[in-house]
Curated annotation (Swiss-Prot):
It is found in: Secreted. Does not inhibit elastase or chymotrypsin. No target protease has been identified to date. GO terms for biological process: response to cytokine; response to peptide hormone. Murine alpha-1-antitrypsin is represented by a cluster of up to 6 individual Serpina1-related genes. The precise complement of Serpina1-related genes present varies according to the strain of the animal. GO terms for cellular component: extracellular space. Glycans are attached at N64, N101, N265. This is Alpha-1-antitrypsin 1-5. One of its GO terms (molecular function) is serine-type endopeptidase inhibitor activity. The reactive center loop (RCL) extends out from the body of the protein and directs binding to the target protease. The protease cleaves the serpin at the reactive site within the RCL, establishing a covalent linkage between the serpin reactive site and the active site of the protease. The resulting inactive serpin-protease complex is highly stable. Variability within the reactive center loop (RCL) sequences of Serpina1-related genes may determine target protease specificity. Belongs to the serpin family.
Length: 413
């Protein structure tokens, strides 16, 4: 008699709050000598870069008319941890779907790289708030394989919770409380429904709160037009910043590139395509170009106008990951026998990723002056982010992409 299938839920959450710092701006050039260049850090950053772009392109393929926002780190971490308990084709599909070449990289190196990344991300920083968390929620009569449990704790800093999934409302509350606490109340009710036979839930969250090194003055924020497409225009609060900024035009991408640093170890890369060049940007962008932008910093006098916004992403990862080759884990052929000691096979019934982004100007303190002084030898560029653009937020030590987004309509949350 074939044993019944028990359900496993994979829940991912991401939060990014970008808040301007009302402190005197730091005008020093970014010191790239402090970057963490260890092999483990470099390995994971390379693969996450490939994975982030592959995932982004799949989202664009599914819908190129809506905002996009997700955390490659959150998604990759959760699936990598799940691979600890997978076997056979299920195991291979997960790691290859995360862009790892299994003939060149050992599984031990992969998990060591994630361990190193999570240690880096959770490193205390007085100026930047960045933390991640992994929760394993296990039915109280289910026994996990000791090897899986030990490696999940050691490599992924996982916390384990025993819950009674027969009491679905109480089980949902335990899981949602974990995510809500980890994201400081920004993501609530992450789980809306649990399948009847759920016995195991893996939840991952990432929280990021950063303050700009070069702050925006709220008094300079004015209502302005944002061109969603050729026929749609919306009004948005447009922030303005002038000064020595890291901005240049990339002919390869047919786009303007703006790098903005946070107090702490994070950088945002904004990509504003020339008129009609969004598709070219999306098809041409690669991790090598982004790496050059991060390493070859150059400042010039410039002025930028960028919308204040709050957007979110909510994705069913089965439809997102399947085109990347991760399919077996979602069907009855899944082999997750390395997770539990029970005879009933596990299948991933749900994989949900939720992410929230806020770029705002809260607070009433006067910002340091960012007014240009003196004359220009040539006219400085003035960038208006008044049409769809992309952005990627990186952790500097590991150069790992924390968040990737596309703003099509800043009025849609």
């Amino acid at each position: 008699m074939t044993p019944s299938i028990s359900w496993c839920l994979l829940l991912l959450a991401g939060l990014c709050c970008l808040v301007p710092s009302f402190l005197a701006e730091d005008v020093q050039e970014t010191d790239t000598s402090q970057k963490d260049q260890s092999p483990a850090s470099h390995e994971i950053a390379t693969n996450l870069g490939d994975f982030a772009i592959s995932l982004y392109r799949e989202l664009v393929h599914q819908s190129n008319t809506s905002n996009i926002f997700f955390s490659p780190v959150s998604i990759a971490t959760a699936f990598a941890m799940l691979s600890l308990g997978s076997k056979g084709d299920t195991h291979t599909q997960i790691l290859e779907g995360l862009q790892f070449n299994l003939t060149q990289t050992s599984e031990a190196d992969i998990h060591n790289s994630f361990q190193h990344l999570l240690q880096t991300l959770n490193r205390p920083d007085s100026e930047l708030q960045l933390s991640t968390g992994n929760g394993l929620f296990v039915n109280n009569d289910l026994k996990l394989v000791e090897k899986f449990l030990e490696e999940a704790k050691n490599h992924y800093q996982a916390e384990v919770f025993s819950v009674n999934f027969a009491e679905s409302e109480e089980a949902k509350k335990v899981i949602n409380d974990f995510v809500e606490k980890g994201t400081q109340g920004k993501i609530v009710e992450a789980v809306k429904k649990l399948e009847q036979d759920t016995v195991f839930v893996l939840a991952n969250y990432i929280l990021f709160k950063g303050k700009w090194k070069k702050p925006f003055d709220p008094e300079n924020t004015k209502q302005a037009e944002f061109h969603v497409d050729e026929s749609t225009t919306v009004k948005v609060p447009m922030m303005t910043l002038s000064g020595m900024l890291d901005v240049h035009h990339c002919s390869t991408l047919s786009s303007w590139v703006l790098l903005m640093d946070y107090a702490g170890n994070a950088t945002a890369v904004f990509l504003l395509p020339d008129d009609g060049k969004m598709q070219h940007l999306e098809q041409t962008l690669n991790k090598e170009l982004i790496s050059k932008f991060l390493l070859n910093r150059r400042r010039r006098l410039a002025q930028i106008h960028i919308p204040r916004l709050s957007i979110s992403g909510n994705y069913n990862l089965e439809t997102l990951m399947s085109p990347l080759g991760i399919t077996r884990i979602f069907n009855s052929g899944a082999d997750l026998s390395g997770i539990t000691e029970e005879n009933a096979p596990l299948k991933l019934s749900q994989a949900v990723h939720k992410a929230v982004l806020t770029i705002d100007e809260t607070g009433t303190e006067a910002a340091a002056a960012t007014v240009l002084q003196g004359g220009f030898l040539s006219m400085p560029p003035i960038l208006h982010f008044n049409r769809p653009f992309l952005f990627i937020i990186f952790e500097e030590h590991s150069q790992s992409p924390l968040f990737v987004g596309k703003v099509v309509d800043p009025t849609h949350k």
